[in-house]
A protein has these predicted regions:
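Short C-terminal tail/terminal secondary-structure segment
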Residues: 2-5, 111, 228-229, 246, ...
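Residue(s) in the substrate-gating loop at a strand-loop-helix junction
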Residues: 163
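Canonical Rossmann dinucleotide-binding motif of NAD(H)/NADP(H)-dependent dehydrogenases/reductases
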Residues: 2-43
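Alpha-helical segment proximal to the catalytic Tyr-Lys
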Residues: 29, 142, 191-193, 254
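Substrate-binding pocket helix/loop in short-chain dehydrogenase/reductase
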Residues: 111-114, 118-123, 226
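Active-site helix of classical SDR
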Residues: 137, 179-182
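Short, small/polar-rich loop/turn modules that mediate ligand/substrate recognition or access, typified
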Residues: 195-200, 256-258
Length: 272
């Protein structure tokens, strides 16, 4: 440990966007269990459109129970001003960031055929799912490079939560598929660009995971899973994705930058 570091700096810090619920919540709790202090970003609303802190505060409580410190920050990742303020708040609170998990993501508010989908829906989904993480990574990567110069013995990693939709056609939610395909290329680009600084960049591709997002199509996927759409015939759980993030956080894949990790019950396998 660099002699300049104070005692308060010893615990690693991870940022998890969309960290209040679902996959993000599971990742945040998993990282807290590994000894990270955790920053969770969220942008939750109640059913009637009011800002909602309920899920974020529950996640904060569960992280604290692991003995970790947690900072909850409400921010819209698609907003440049929010991203800048968000990163500044992390710097002010913890003074470091060792890991960024770009997890925040949305589905279209209404599934619509490709020939009927609206530009407003496209802009919303691409803004949150692709533009947001693309430019948040830019901000955090620059900060990581600065840290790497000052503290060369630390390790820095970025994880993008993609989707099997990055390569699977779903014409009723084309904007979502395009956003996740973009995340795949974003991962390769940043892995290439940041390798010289020792910053590993990875993509995790979840399959059919039981979350709020998939609850609206549960009956459909129950049948597909029972019929064998995945070799492992069960719903994936947020904790399955969190375990993959854990392996990266522990440095077990540091020579595998740019790698895609499928957490999909074998969906990606081509079978006859």
């Amino acid at each position: 440990m660099n002699a300049k570091e104070s005692l308060k700096d010893k615990r690693q810090v991870a940022i998890v966007t969309g960290g209040s619920r679902g996959i993000g919540r599971a990742i945040a709790i998993e990282l807290a269990g590994l000894g990270f202090n955790v920053v969770i970003n969220h942008y939750d609303f109640t059913a009637d459109g009011r800002p909602d802190e309920t899920a974020a505060q529950k996640t904060l409580s569960d992280i604290a129970a692991k003995g970790a410190r947690c900072l909850v920050l409400r921010a819209d990742v698609s907003s440049d001003a929010d991203r800048v303020a968000f990163v500044k708040a992390v710097k002010d609170k913890f003074g470091r960031c060792d890991m960024l998990v770009n997890n925040a993501g949305v589905a279209p508010l209404k599934r619509a055929d490709l020939l009927e989908a609206t530009e407003a829906s496209f802009d919303r989904v691409l803004g949150i799912n692709l533009k947001g993480p693309y430019f948040l990574t830019q901000l955090v990567a620059k900060w990581m490079i600065e840290q790497q110069i000052q503290y060369p013995n630390r390790s820095y990693r970025i994880v993008n939560i993609g989707s099997m939709s990055s390569y699977t056609s779903s014409p009723a939610r084309g904007e979502y598929c395009i956003s996740k395909a973009g995340v795949s290329m974003m991962t390769m680009l940043y892995a290439d660009r940041l390798a010289e600084f020792g910053i590993g960049v990875f993509e995790i591709r979840p399959g059919i995971i039981e979350t709020d997002m998939t609850s609206v199509v549960k009956e459909k996927y129950d049948k597909l899973i029972a019929d064998g759409i995945t070799p492992i015939k069960r719903w994936g759980q947020p904790e399955d994705v969190a375990k993959a993030v854990s392996a990266i956080a522990e440095g077990k894949l540091d020579f595998s930058t740019g790698q895609v990790i499928n957490v999909d019950g074998g969906f990606h396998l081509r079978r006859l």
